[in-house]
Each structure stands twice: as structure tokens, then as C-alpha cells.
Amino acid sequence: GSIIGTFVPTFISIPAVGTSITFLIFAGILLTLSAVYFISSKISMMKIKKLPVAILIFILSCVFGHNGSFAFWQNNLTYEGESVYNYLQVYEDDRQIALSTNVIFGVQSVYLKEGTLTGMYYDYALAAPFMSGVYENESNDMLILGMGTGTYATQCEKYFSGERMTIEGVEIDEKITELSKKYFHASDKIKVTTYDGRAYLNAIDKKYDVIMVDAYQDITIPFQMSSREFFTLVKNHLKENGVMVVN
């Protein structure tokens, strides 16, 4: 039971049909097993009569239970859904469009409708191209590990577009990349690879002027991207005057 309960939801049912329906599937399995037991064993009729009540509750849950929003604290969401890795919310107001993943407070990515600076850490990270010699280099290559919906990439494209800058992104969650194009005006000029950031560095030889590390799982840094080996790997993919910037 523990093995099935661990691996089937994680690798099969949640990616295929989502969390709500996964709960209903397993509830149905448990209800079926209980019904078989009550009917086949010598249980008093009084207890067996309670079985239709459980079946009725299950049917009502199937009809009404999977349509409710998880984000009961948030009204007027532009988008709400699940991916293999995250529970995703996109919300919009007069000033911005924002993406949140798995958390009540905070945002994962943001797009300012007026095209201004965000007032967040992305603005400070704009110093990295200056440190790598963006105006002196014949060409500038940037890699963003943890692309999200492209907040940092959009800013760099706006402020350094005339400096022959090529921006590449790596994002493990393909659904977030889809949302970036649908809601966050992500540029088609920016190549985004669906892959783990560390695995991507292991697979390529190219070197960059700037490597931005902004990979998070919820509010924690992935363990494989916080080790000495990882930072050595990043260093080996930087040009002579290359700069790494980390959120």
C-alpha cells in the first residue's frame, strides 16, 4: 500500500489527471475494498446499511468535489492549474501579471504592463551584464537557469537589446514555459530548453558572459544546485570575464 501510494500518484495519476481526481480515484478504490469486505464477511445488516451513505458521499464528491479552486484565498485568477512539478496560479491587475507556484504569499515571476523595473531582485541582477563588459564585448551570451516566465530575460532583452546579446533559458517545468508565452509576452527570440539546470550544464560545452541561477522548488533551492560541484560547473561555463548571479 505504501509503495503504490507513493509511486502511482507521483508518476502516473497526478501528472495525468491532477490532484483532485487522484484523490477521488484512491477514495473509490478504498470504498470498493470496503464494500467487498462488508458484503462478503459476516457483518451485521445494521453496519451494511451504512454503505449506501458512503457511496452517496463519494458520488457527490465526484460530481462537485473536483471543480473547486484550490486557491480559496485568491479571487479572480486568470489561470489556475497543475503541472508535473507545480500548482500554478496566474493573476492580473492594472499594473502587473504575476505567477505563483505552490505558495499563498509571494510570486515566482512578474510582468509589468508599463515595461518598468519590477522593484524586485531582478532589477539588481541587471548589474551583471555591466560587470561582464556588455559594452566592450563583441557579443554577449547569457544563460538563465530557472527561466520561469522570463522576467529577467525580458528585462535584459529590453535594456541590452542593442548590445548583440543572445539569451538562453532553462526551465524544468514545460507548463510554465507555455504560460510565459500565453500571458507574460515572452519573446520568441529567446530559446528555452525544458531540462534540469545542472543536467543542462553537464550536457553542453558553451561558455557564457552571464549565468543567472534562479532555480527554486517552492521556496527552497534544489539540493543539486547548491553544492560545490554545481558552482564549479557554473564556473567552467563562464568566459574569462564571465559573471554568475544568484537569487
Listing of model-derived features with the role each one plays in the protein:
Residues 116, 123-247:
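The AdoMet/dcAdoMet-binding core of the Class I SAM-like
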Residues 9, 70, 77-80, 193, ...:
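Short, functionally important structural connectors and interaction interfaces within domains
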Residues 1-40:
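Membrane-embedded alpha-helical segments of integral membrane proteins
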Residues 37-104:
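Basic, ligand-binding patches in group-transfer machinery
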Residues 104-108, 216-219:
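A short, flexible beta-alpha/helix-coil linker loop
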Residues 109-113:
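Short acidic, glycine/proline-rich loop/turn micro-motifs
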